[in-house]
Amino acid sequence: LLQNSIKKLKSKKIKISVINTPGIFEIPITIKMNIKKFDAFVALGCVIKGDTPHFNLICSSTFDAIMQLSIKFDKPIGNGIITALNMRQAVERSGKIGSVKPNKGAEAAHAVLSILENDPKKI
């Protein structure tokens, strides 16, 4: 995810910084703490469903918080967080070698680039 996201952003000469979090639940607060330092964010991660409702709660609250931050602070945030039912799905969606699915990291970076290119404040 990260390598393909970086590759996509660098292809457009975007200056990047990588900030790691312990898990996806910590992504929104990390973005909020850094919201004034960057023009945009690409959130990357992976959650694989287990046997409890924890998966649904974590994913739902994280995705909602990311969207709320994007709207509140008028900042594009590409969501490259993979939600998968099993490891096979996670690997397919991550763009690993042999995967036939598109890479979610590159897709999230592309989404951010599209928003930045159409930013009316830059016109």
Predicted regions located by residue number:
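Phosphate-binding/catalytic loops
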Residues: 85-102
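A charged, well-structured terminal subsegment
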Residues: 99-123
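Glycine-rich phosphate/diphosphate-binding loop of Rossmann-like nucleotide-binding domains
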Residues: 1-18, 22
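Glycine-rich phosphate-binding loop
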Residues: 29-66
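Short, ordered loop/turn segments at secondary-structure junctions
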Residues: 21-24, 46-47, 82-86
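Short, acidic/small-residue loops that bind anionic groups at enzyme active sites
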Residues: 56-84, 102-104
